Regions:
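N-terminal small-residue-enriched
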Residues: 1-208
């Protein structure tokens, strides 16, 4: 959800065109106070890391959301002037055959203060989505739908029966604002992100 429904909406490719739910939101509250998120292209040997982006700008750790406040977009040189926003070292492309655009590198929520067990015990009724599958996102609205490949019901603070065929439907901006607990168990996944500038390696991570 972070990668697809939230941070794609922070890429200048969408923001500069006014096609993002996060347009004109810098310095504003876009998430719960406990939410902190970064895009860090400097992590040593990480799958999505780069020394410099494809415009020659050094990579950096960009703080996207700090204590719920939107701090930065992901911005390439071309869109920097349009948006009056600093360049963030986020211009990427698969190869010389593609035009560069603003893209993610290693994107993740920072750890919170709650344990996995504390989060489960505090949930009277809910869904533990252990593994997500395919879906779709509208970056202009933040609305998404994702298949739950592996999921379980949470009932009275306990994980109970498995769930088959579940789909999560919602809005990235609403999800961010309603996060009330974040785990201390950050876990990252590796993949290839496709866009108009081709496929590039990225990492996405989040705690429970």
């Amino acid at each position: 959800i972070l990668h697809e429904a939230c941070v794609h909406g922070l890429e200048a490719t969408s923001v500069a065109k006014g096609m993002s739910v996060f347009c004109n939101k810098l310095g504003q509250k876009v998430a719960s106070d406990i939410v902190n998120a970064v895009d860090d292209g400097t992590n040593l040997n990480a799958w999505g890391s780069i020394n410099v982006d494809d415009e020659g700008t050094p990579s950096k750790c960009n703080v996207l959301i700090e204590n719920g406040i939107l701090k930065s977009y992901l911005v390439d040189k071309r869109n920097s002037k349009k948006m009056n926003h600093p360049i963030t070292g986020s211009s990427r492309r698969e190869s010389y055959k593609y035009q560069t655009t603003s893209r993610m590198t290693n994107t993740y929520f920072l750890n919170g203060k709650s344990t996995f067990d504390e989060i489960i015990k505090s949930t009277e009724k809910g869904l533990f989505a252990e593994k997500m599958g395919g879906g779709s996102v509208n970056p202009a609205t933040g609305e998404f739908n994702f298949a739950v490949q592996v999921g379980y019901m949470i009932e009275n603070g306990k994980i109970t029966k498995p769930v088959k065929g579940a789909t999560l439907v919602g809005s990235g901006k609403d999800v961010l604002l309603h996060i009330d607990m974040i785990g201390d168990n950050l876990s990252c996944g590796y993949g290839m992100c496709g866009s108009m500038s081709g496929s590039v390696p990225t990492i996405v991570g989040q705690p429970t």
